[in-house]
């Protein structure tokens, strides 16, 4: 991890990250992780920079070694009702609330922080700078990819396992061909257009 980031002076620090703000389908998934200082995990990095195999291995190690971890989510209906930013903040609040040890301080990837009952700080590129945020990004990514694999079994014609719900050429073609599933985000412009909303 880079040394430019100065950790807050706190005993229990949770890292929080989200996956799935951009896709047209499925929940936005967040994770909160408090790492054990005496049980380091080698190879933590931004989940987007790791191979799927490495992510899966690290996710198991994080779950085994972290002091505690929790996932949060906001469903497509919530995203449509609140908008993606507010739904993401809600999912982050849920991840932090789900921790069975309350952190003293929360570090959140990006430039915005949700309202939390403890001090928090946003960290730009936090998934590359802060071990706790990297761990959260890995857990959230693995969980969301698993959900997309399950959705792919339910709706094999859409190719969800390939594009993970992101707005790719293939996804647009399948939307045109088959219409939207109940899991598509109806407030997102390409889906809205297909549904004629």
Curated annotation (Swiss-Prot):
Keywords: Cytoplasm, Endonuclease, Hydrolase, Manganese, Metal-binding, Nuclease. One of its GO terms (cellular component) is cytoplasm. Endonuclease that specifically degrades the RNA of RNA-DNA hybrids. Its cofactor is Mn(2+); Mg(2+). Pfam families: RNase_HII (PF01351). This is Ribonuclease HII. It comes from Actinobacillus pleuropneumoniae serotype 5b (strain L20). It catalyses: Endonucleolytic cleavage to 5'-phosphomonoester.
